[in-house]
Amino acid sequence: MLVAPEALRIAYLQTVLTVDGRPASDVADEMGSFWVVTAHNPLSEQLAAAKNTELHQELCGRLDEMGYQSLPALGSSPDGTWVEESIAVFGAGKRPIRALGREFNQHGVFEVTKRTLRVHGCFSRWTVQR
């Protein structure tokens, strides 16, 4: 079983999420809870930009197949030195989103509600929140 190190889980909680250029919390206030997933940098291994773009396009295709409403999103470190193109997904449950995260070799996926940001492990059952 693959488990994200504690330091990585803490870093995930510091992630700044935007959806279509807006703070994720504003979008949750307007549209309700949603998930944020990425295909960039699988298992935190930094890849070339072209490979990350290819993976992102594959993720977009999978979400289209699954029939979920989605919007473009970004996840970044607080200082902006680490930015990953992501997708905000509406109307999905935890199980299919975690499975999608595993499919794209992601340690975790983000759940955004009006008051809380949670990060759920994809390969093991852990959750952290702020």
Enumerate the language-model features and the residues they cover:
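Short, low-order "capping/linker" segments at domain edges
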Residues: S86, G121-R130
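Structural alpha-beta junctions
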Residues: Q57-S70, N105-H107
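N-terminal, charge-rich interaction modules
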Residues: M1-R62
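Short, compact, well-ordered microdomains
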Residues: W82-S86, F90-V119
